[in-house]
Amino acid sequence: AALFQPGAMQAFLGQMGDAEVTQRFSQLLLSMANVSPDNIRQALVASGLFGEFFLSRQMQSRLDVKQLMRKLLVDGKLTSELKASVGQLVDEIEGHQIEGLQARQSQQISYHFVIPFSDANPVEVNFERGAAKDDGGSSDWVINLHTDAEDLGPLWLKTTVKANREIDMILWASWSDSASKAEAASNILQQSLQGFDLTLNKLTVLNAARPSIDSSLTGS
């Protein structure tokens, strides 16, 4: 995610030296001002998690983050520092691919990726769902988000979506004014979720950094 910080991104694009690659990379960036469910879906597809899957199925896919990073490692005119950052990003994507494969082998789902923005700091996203319950019912979806917003500070959000479409949310905000803003906007959030036929059952806002606890003990 460090590579997708606005300052690093400008330096990165400036050293590409390839107008076509720069344009393609820019197309992968979302706008925080116009974010929507469709662009989140597109960001997941373009995250690099599914490139090998599409190739194995002989399915056409657009250039994704991982393919572009690999291309830059071979063709790009990058400084040694940026080359190391690009290599680290590829390693992270491949690590998340392995996590997803291991989850699928256990009848679970796990997608971990980063959404880059043109007008905001990147957002780290992790979707998870456990195996089906013993009674055949669906397990809850757990969605974790993390970003360090310039105007709101570090934020962590854990959302649990139940089979009955009820939602529980926990927000950790390091800045006290950001926590206050989140509490004040709870009614707006509830109304927005209703537009997607979702019910906000509980929202907990904590003025603190999210504790680092083993996800296997907490359900992420």
Residue ranges and their predicted role:
Residues 1-220:
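Extended non-catalytic alpha-helical interaction modules
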